[in-house]
Structure formats: structure tokens, C-alpha cells
């Protein structure tokens, strides 16, 4: 069922609001994907707080007008699914991970930090660890010397107790 003008304006407003908050937008062709697989992709996107939507390209072009993602408009051809996220890596990671298991989802382009990326750029962005992963690695590295020192002190205390007994 075609959308009337008010519905189209509502869709553009909704997507524009998401794009205004976004750091990353990823475009992927979804030609031939089964509905069940697309539902799994949407569920994974929701888990990662990625706004995932199939849009008419003309509506998507209007939504990105006047934003840092405007250069993506020339890539918006064919049946596309749009991944939009506030996290710099989440959209790229969700779409890239799904495209590895389903060859019918083809990454077309993306934009991060005002720069348009091709498929290789999106894949490179997806390979970067998330902020949480980096923080946990940093915490581990910082805790390692402290825990080693604590173990050395405990061993020294046990040795002193053994000598005293």
C-alpha cells in the first residue's frame, strides 16, 4: 500500500531524528533475503541499539539532507536497508556480521565522521573493538600489575608465617 504525503513526512521526520543523533550510517542491499533471516537481523540490531529500516531511497535522501551523511545520497540506489547508530561501530558491526553468514546481504556503503566509506571501509570499521571491549582490556591491563603485587605480598606473608612456626 503506497504511503500518502503525511505518512511520508512522518517517516522522513522519524529517520531524520535518528540520523541527527547518529555517528554512523550503513547501507546494504537485501535482495533475496528470506523474511526469517531479515527478522533475525532486526532482532540483533535492536540488541545493539541500531536503528534498522528498509526505506524508499527518495525518503532516505530527504532524511539525510543537510547532515554530515548527505554525501551518501548518491549511493542510495536499489533495494537498501539502512543501519543507523549513535555508537560509532555498532551499525557496521551488526550489518557486517550478518553479511558474513548471509551472502545475499551485500554491504554497499557507509558513512562515519562525515566520510563516505565503501564496503572495505565498513568492514574495517566493523573490525574495531567496541568501546566496552576496549575499556575491559584496559581495566585488565591496569589490574594485572596490582594483582601480581598482591599475590607476591600474600606469598611473602605465608613465607614469614611458615618461618615463624
UniProtKB/Swiss-Prot annotation:
Keywords: Ribonucleoprotein, Ribosomal protein, RNA-binding, rRNA-binding. The lineage of its organism: Bacteria, Pseudomonadati, Pseudomonadota, Betaproteobacteria, Burkholderiales. GO terms for molecular function: large ribosomal subunit rRNA binding. The gene is rplJ. One of its GO terms (cellular component) is ribonucleoprotein complex. Forms part of the ribosomal stalk, playing a central role in the interaction of the ribosome with GTP-bound translation factors. Part of the ribosomal stalk of the 50S ribosomal subunit. The N-terminus interacts with L11 and the large rRNA to form the base of the stalk. The C-terminus forms an elongated spine to which L12 dimers bind in a sequential fashion forming a multimeric L10(L12)X complex. This is Large ribosomal subunit protein uL10. InterPro entries: Ribosomal_uL10 (IPR001790), Ribosomal_uL10-like_sf (IPR043141), Ribosomal_uL10_bac (IPR022973), Ribosomal_uL10_bac_type (IPR047865). Belongs to the universal ribosomal protein uL10 family. HAMAP family: Ribosomal_uL10. One of its GO terms (biological process) is translation.
Amino acid at each position: 500500500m503506497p504511503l500518502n504525503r503525511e505518512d511520508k513526512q512522518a517517516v522522513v521526520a522519524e529517520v531524520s531524528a535518528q540520523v541527527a543523533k547518529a555517528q554512523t550510517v550503513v547501507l546494504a542491499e537485501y535482495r533475496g533475503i528470506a523474511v526469517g533471516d531479515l527478522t533475525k537481523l532486526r532482532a540483533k540490531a535492536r540488541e545493539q541499539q541500531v536503528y534498522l529500516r528498509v526505506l524508499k531511497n527518495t525518503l532516505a535522501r530527504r532524511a539525510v539532507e543537510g547532515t554530515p551523511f548527505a554525501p551518501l545520497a548518491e549511493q542510495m540506489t536499489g533495494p537498501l536497508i539502512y543501519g543507523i547508530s549513535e555508537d560509532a561501530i555498532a551499525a557496521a558491526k551488526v550489518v557486517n556480521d550478518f553479511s558474513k553468514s548471509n551472502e545475499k546481504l551485500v554491504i554497499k556503503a557507509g558513512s562515519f565522521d562525515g566520510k563516505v566509506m565503501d564496503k572495505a571501509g565498513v568492514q574495517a570499521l566493523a573490525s574495531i573493538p567496541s568501546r566496552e571491549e576496549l575499556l575491559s582490556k584496559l581495566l585488565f591491563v591496569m589490574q594485572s600489575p596490582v594483582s601480581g603485587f598482591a599475590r607476591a605480598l600474600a606469598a611473602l606473608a605465608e613465607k614469614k608465617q611458615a618461618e615463624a612456626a
